[in-house]
Amino acid sequence: LKPVDSHGKALTCDNAGCENTDFDWPWMQHAASLTSRGTLIVFDNGDARHLEQPALPTMKYSRGVEYRINEKDMTVQQVWEYGKDRGFAWYAPVTGNIRYDGSKDVMQIFASSTGIFDKSKKAIESTFDVIDYKTKKIELEMKIKMMGKKNMPYRAEKIDPKIAF
C-alpha cells in the first residue's frame, strides 16, 4: 500500500517515517478491525517504531489509529489518531485494543500494559479511555490497577448490559 494525504497525493516515506505529515505505520499492533465506516483501526503499541529504539525509553508512545484503504488504487490514508500526545505515560508495549462505537461516535481505547517497565511502579496500571471522535476529548477515563507486574491485562471492551444479557 502507498501512503497518501487527504487529497490522495502520494507521501514520501521510508523506514524512518513519512516526510511533512503525521502519517505513520503501526508498530507492534494489536486488535485490528474494520469499522462500520469501512475504515481499519488498530492499537499501535509503538515498540521498535521505524525499526529502531529511541534514544530514551521515555520517548516511546502508543496510539489508536484509523486508516482508510483504497484497495483499487492500493493506497492508505491515516484519517485519525489518538495517544501520541500522551507520550510514555500512556505507552503500552505489550497489548491493547481499540473499538469504534458508531452509536455515540466515540473510540474506546485500552492501553493495557502501561507502566510495565517503570521500576518505580509495583503494578501495571492500565487505562481505558472513551474518546470523542471529532474533538478527541476524553469522555471517560478509567485507570485499572493490576495486582502486580505479573498480571497482564489483554483487552477491555465497553458493553451494553441490555444487549449482553
Regions found by a protein language model. Name each.
Residues 1-165:
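Histidine-/acidic-rich catalytic cores in large beta-rich domains
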